[in-house]
């Protein structure tokens, strides 16, 4: 449902995802060096590097190291991603949840069955009533489904914010490229926008109307707002099986990511140490970057829970796959170069694929 002032939101999001995904796909293709393939891969590798993969080697000159440092930021700035993600997701979640509560409840009105019977008794308008009723109910489900998916996203960014502060111990020398940093900030704004893109226009219009009414009438003339907790939560429990399958996939991926992050967090007991060891346990026994694999599972769960009806959600998922796969391959190469005894049976991110 498009609303004046917001008609281009979904196309803009799709274009933004294409612009960020396409260079990664092109860099992964076997383009000859003469055609610029090697240069593009080196640029993308530099932009996506962080932590151990961005640290200059001891053999590099001090001038080269200082030059590289100009285009990097501390890896502990990862926290900025999740602060931005929490803010963006929370604002959208509260706005759309409020809109759904005020305009999209009850999800299944008790009178609907009686109205349908009456329409059949009347006869002439039964089919048109059924079509309108079906569209209305379908739209209500869509809005509440968006609330459900935003709740999953909120859980994800809140957990990642906690882990960044309390689980990971970034080395003082760990850096990430400024382009990767800006891409991360973009991602944690665009991701919740994509998950809610189809509902944002109407929710924004409703909230604007409420604010305008408040300004004109004043608080004394506005009706009292009474929040019924059952009406706030009950529609979420009446969503379809697709949402709950998506939630189960999301939880499965989250549990494995929690374990893998805990393993990574304990590799360096001393925060000032730069020493790296081979991680083992959980999905690390299969792939080099199981926390990335878990991220793919998490966002696949969100895609399933969303119903897959909105194109920006698909573009978001494609970006997650390409971005994390590219980064995982670079990390896998680093492990193989760093450790002579690194298990050759491990894949980069997806078992039996890459």
Curated annotation (Swiss-Prot):
Keywords, in A-Z order: Cell membrane, Membrane, NADP, Oxidoreductase, Transmembrane, Transmembrane helix
Transmembrane segments: 11-31, 78-98, 141-158, 176-196, 235-255, 301-321
GO CC terms of this entry: endoplasmic reticulum; plasma membrane
Catalytic activities: a di-trans,poly-cis-dolichal + NADP(+) = a di-trans,poly-cis-polyprenal + NADPH + H(+)
Membrane topology recorded in Swiss-Prot or TrEMBL: Multi-pass membrane protein
Subcellular location: Cell membrane
One Gene Ontology MF term: polyprenal reductase activity
Gene Ontology terms describing biological process: dolichol biosynthetic process; dolichol-linked oligosaccharide biosynthetic process; polyprenol catabolic process
Pathway: Protein modification; protein glycosylation
Gene3D superfamilies listed in its UniProt record: 1.20.120.1630
One of the Pfam families matching this protein, by short name: Steroid_dh
Superkingdom of origin: Eukaryota
Record EC number: 1.3.1.94
Protein family according to the UniProt entry: Belongs to the steroid 5-alpha reductase family. Polyprenal reductase subfamily.
Biological role stated in the UniProt entry: Plays a key role in early steps of protein N-linked glycosylation by being involved in the conversion of polyprenol into dolichol. Acts as a polyprenal reductase that mediates the reduction of polyprenal into dolichal in a NADP-dependent mechanism. Dolichols are required for the synthesis of dolichol-linked monosaccharides and the oligosaccharide precursor used for N-glycosylation.
PANTHER family cross-referenced by the UniProt entry: DFG10 PROTEIN, POLYPRENOL REDUCTASE
Name the UniProt record assigns to this protein: Polyprenal reductase 1
Organism per entry: Oryza sativa subsp. indica (Rice)
């Amino acid at each position: 449902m498009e609303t004046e002032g917001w008609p281009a939101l979904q196309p803009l999001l799709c274009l933004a995802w294409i612009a960020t995904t396409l260079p990664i796909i092109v860099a992964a293709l076997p383009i000859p060096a003469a055609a610029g393939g090697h240069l593009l891969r080196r640029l993308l590798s530099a932009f996506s590097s962080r932590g151990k993969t961005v640290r200059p080697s001891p053999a590099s000159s001090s001038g080269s190291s200082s030059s590289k440092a100009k285009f990097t930021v501390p890896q502990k700035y990862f926290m900025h991603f999740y602060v931005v993600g929490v803010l963006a997701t929370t604002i959208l979640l509260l706005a759309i949840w409020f809109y759904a509560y005020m305009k999209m409840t009850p999800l299944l009105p008790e009178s609907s069955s009686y109205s349908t019977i009456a329409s059949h008794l009347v006869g002439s308008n039964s089919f048109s009533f059924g079509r309108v009723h079906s569209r209305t109910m379908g739209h209500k489900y869509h809005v509440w489904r968006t609330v459900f998916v935003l709740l999953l996203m909120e859980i994800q960014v809140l957990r990642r914010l906690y882990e960044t502060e309390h689980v990971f111990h970034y080395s003082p020398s760990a850096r990430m490229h400024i382009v990767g940093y800006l891409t991360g900030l973009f991602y944690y704004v665009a991701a919740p926008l994509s998950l809610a893109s189809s509902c944002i226009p109407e929710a924004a219009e409703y909230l604007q109307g409420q604010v305008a009414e408040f300004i004109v009438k004043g608080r004394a003339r506005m009706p009292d707002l009474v929040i019924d907790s059952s009406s706030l939560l009950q529609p979420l429990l009446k969503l379809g099986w697709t949402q709950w399958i998506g939630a189960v996939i999301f939880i499965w991926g989250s549990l494995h990511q929690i374990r893998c992050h805990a393993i990574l967090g304990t590799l360096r007991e001393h925060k000032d140490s730069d020493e790296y060891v081979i991680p083992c346990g959980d999905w690390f026994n299969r792939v080099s970057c199981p926390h990335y694999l878990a991220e793919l599972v998490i966002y696949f769960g969100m895609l399933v829970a969303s119903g897959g009806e909105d194109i920006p959600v698909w573009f978001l998922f494609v970006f997650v796959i390409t971005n994390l796969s590219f980064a995982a391959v670079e990390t896998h190469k680093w492990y193989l170069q760093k450790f002579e005894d690194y298990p050759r049976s491990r894949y980069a991110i997806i078992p039996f694929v890459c």
